[in-house]
From Swiss-Prot:
Biological role: Oxidase; part of the gene cluster that mediates the biosynthesis of fusaric acid, a mycotoxin with low to moderate toxicity to animals and humans, but with high phytotoxic properties. L-aspartate is suggested as fusaric acid amino acid precursor that is activated and further processed to O-acetyl-L-homoserine by cluster enzymes aspartate kinase FUB3 and homoserine O-acetyltransferase FUB5, as well as enzymes of the primary metabolism.
Gene (UniProt): FUB9
Source superkingdom: Eukaryota
SUPFAM superfamilies cross-referenced by the UniProt entry: FMN-linked oxidoreductases (SSF51395)
Entry's family note: Belongs to the FMN-dependent alpha-hydroxy acid dehydrogenase family.
Ligand binding (a 2-oxocarboxylate): 32, 175, 248
UniProt KW Flavoprotein keyword: yes
Domain FMN hydroxy acid dehydrogenase: start-end pairs: 6-350
UniProt KW keywords: Flavoprotein, FMN, Oxidoreductase
Name of the protein described by the UniProt record: Oxidase FUB9
Length: 358
C-alpha cells in the first residue's frame, strides 16, 4: 500500500467526515461552519439530545424489502432527508452549491438553496436534468423586497417547488469565533447587493405578502415555539421547519429534537413538519420521524462533504446517512416510512424507568 493510500482518512461515519473535512479547511472557514453563537450551548445540545431518545425495535417483522421513499413539495424523495440552506458553499470547496446539488440530484435528495449562495439558482437546479429532484429557494425578510420578488420569479422559472422563509434571523447572532478570526466571506457570487433585513416583519403581513408574490409552496424555517407553530398554521403556510439555525443565532435555546416532541402534537396533520439541527446519524433521522417529523434537513454535513472531497464528498455524506437510515429501519422492524411511530422510542425518566414519548 502506498503512503498516499495509507494516509487517506477512513470515513465510516459523519463524525469521521467532520474530522477529515475540518482538517482541510482554514481555521477561519472551519470555525465559521462548525461554530455556533456565544458559548455553543445550543450547538452541543442539538447533538446530545438525540441520546435521550432510546430506540424500541419491533421484531419478527418482514423487512426483506425496505421502502424509504416519501414526498416533499409534491415530488417523490428517496427518503425523508434533504439539504438545508447554508451560505457560500465555495468557502468549503470550489464545487460550491452546484457540487452539492449534483450529489443530491444523483440520489433524489431534496435541496434548499440559500439566497446567499455563490452559484446561481438556475445552475443549481440544472443538475437535476430530468427535474425529478425537488428544490426550494430560501429567502430572508430583506428590506429590499424586490430582491425576494426577483428570486421567487427566477425560482419558479427554474422549476423550484417551494420557498423557505427564514424567520429566526432578523439580525445575525453573535459568533465569537468569527469575531476572533476577523471572518470575511470574500464576497458572494450570487450578486445580491443589499442584505439588510427587515426587522419590522410580522407574521400577518409577511406571509400575506409572500402569498401575493408566488404560487410556490411557502414554508417557514426557524420555528421553535408551539405558539409560533400555531400562528404558522393559522396563516396557512404549507410547512414549518423546526430549527434554531444550528445553534448559530440565539444560544441556550432548546435542542430541536426536544422542540419537535412539543410541537408535533399541535401541528401534525395541519401542516407539514420538518426539522434540522444536530442530525449526525441515520438513527437520528429515524427518531425524528418517530416523533412526528415528515422530513429532516442537514446543513453542516453537506459542507463537510464538500470540504472533504467536493461533490463526491457530499455524495459520501448522503450515502452514509441513507445507508444508516435504511439499516435502522430494518433493525427496528419497519419496511416503510408509515411503519415508524412513537412506539419505536422511549425516554428514561429521572427514576430510571422507561417511558413512552407521548
Amino acid at each position: 500500500m502506498s503512503d498516499a493510500t495509507s494516509s487517506k482518512p477512513q470515513i465510516f461515519s459523519i463524525q469521521d467526515l467532520k474530522q477529515a473535512a475540518s482538517d482541510k479547511m482554514s481555521q477561519m472557514y472551519r470555525d465559521y461552519y462548525n461554530g455556533g453563537a456565544m458559548d455553543n450551548i445550543t450547538l452541543a445540545n442539538n447533538e446530545a439530545a438525540f441520546d435521550r431518545y432510546l430506540l424500541r425495535p419491533r421484531v419478527l417483522r418482514n423487512v426483506s424489502n425496505i421502502d424509504m421513499t416519501t414526498t416533499l413539495w409534491g415530488t417523490k424523495a428517496a427518503l425523508p432527508l434533504g439539504v438545508s440552506p447554508s451560505a457560500m458553499h465555495r468557502l468549503a470547496h470550489a464545487d460550491g452549491e452546484v457540487g452539492t446539488s449534483k450529489a443530491c440530484a444523483a440520489r433524489h435528495v431534496p435541496m434548499i438553496l440559500s439566497a446567499l449562495s455563490n452559484d446561481t439558482l438556475e445552475d443549481v437546479s440544472g443538475q437535476s436534468s430530468d427535474g425529478s429532484t425537488p428544490y426550494a429557494i430560501q429567502v430572508s425578510p430583506f428590506k429590499n423586497r424586490q430582491i425576494t420578488t426577483n428570486l421567487l420569479n427566477r425560482a419558479k422559472a427554474a422549476g423550484y417547488k417551494a420557498v423557505v422563509l427564514t424567520v429566526d434571523a432578523p439580525m445575525f447572532g453573535r459568533r465569537l469565533d468569527d469575531l476572533r478570526n476577523g471572518f470575511s466571506s470574500g464576497g458572494l457570487g450570487g450578486g445580491i447587493p443589499d442584505l439588510s433585513f427587515d426587522t419590522s416583519a410580522t407574521w400577518e403581513e409577511k406571509i400575506a405578502w409572500m402569498k401575493s408574490q408566488t404560487d410556490l409552496e411557502i414554508w417557514v424555517k426557524g420555528v421553535t415555539s408551539p405558539l409560533d407553530a400555531q400562528i404558522a398554521i393559522e396563516q396557512g403556510v404549507d410547512g414549518i421547519i423546526i430549527s434554531n439555525h444550528g445553534g448559530r443565532q440565539l444560544d441556550t435555546t432548546p435542542a430541536t429534537i426536544d422542540i419537535l416532541r412539543e410541537i408535533a402534537p399541535i401541528a401534525k396533520g395541519k401542516t407539514r413538519i420538518a426539522i434540522d439541527g444536530g442530525f449526525r446519524r441515520g438513527s437520528d433521522i429515524f427518531k425524528a420521524v418517530a416523533l412526528g417529523a415528515d422530513f429532516v434537513f442537514v446543513g453542516r454535513i453537506a459542507i463537510w462533504g464538500l470540504a472533504y472531497d467536493g461533490s463526491n464528498g457530499v455524495g459520501l455524506a448522503l450515502d452514509l446517512l441513507i445507508n444508516e437510515f435504511k439499516l435502522c429501519m430494518g433493525l427496528a422492524g419497519c419496511s416503510k416510512i408509515s411503519d415508524i411511530s412513537p412506539a419505536h422510542l422511549s425516554i428514561l425518566n429521572a427514576r430510571g424507568v422507561l417511558e413512552s414519548v407521548y
